[in-house]
Design a protein with these regions (language model features):
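A generic structural signal for tightly packed, nonpolar segments enriched in small/aliphatic residues
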Residues: 1, 6-120
Length: 120
């Protein structure tokens, strides 16, 4: 499913996970301004439930197929409490293959705009 989602979003959108609406919107607007867009992904209790373990308080990987990025975000969320946070999953946009092989530099334009906006 992660592979399908990466293909579905292509090399245009990066996935964003956040527990804070204002932070998520700030990142989305910074990305739009930089022409480096993000697509917000769900943080759902079902992904957290998939991290249950018989051997540890919390597993760091789900035993279910797919949704690896979603369960990874659920894992991160377990450690931040009420702190606003966001994770940009850049796996689908960080590199190009073929004749344009190499790093894209993304999400640097988004992050520069985001930090400028925060400084104002």
């Amino acid at each position: 499913r992660d592979c399908l989602l990466s293909r579905g979003l292509g090399d245009v959108y990066k996935r964003q996970f956040s527990n804070d609406e204002e932070l998520a919107m700030s990142l989305m607007m910074a990305g739009d301004t930089a022409m480096d867009p993000v697509w917000r992904m769900p943080l759902d209790i079902s992904f957290t439930k998939a991290l249950k373990s018989n051997f540890a308080d919390l597993a760091n990987i789900s035993d279910s197929r797919g949704a690896g990025a979603c369960t990874a975000a659920a894992f991160l969320e377990e450690f931040v409490g009420d702190t606003p946070w966001a994770h940009l999953d850049i796996a689908g946009v960080a590199n190009k293959s073929g004749k344009e092989k190499g790093s894209t530099g993304r999400p640097v334009p988004l992050l520069i705009n985001f930090l400028k906006d925060q400084a104002e």
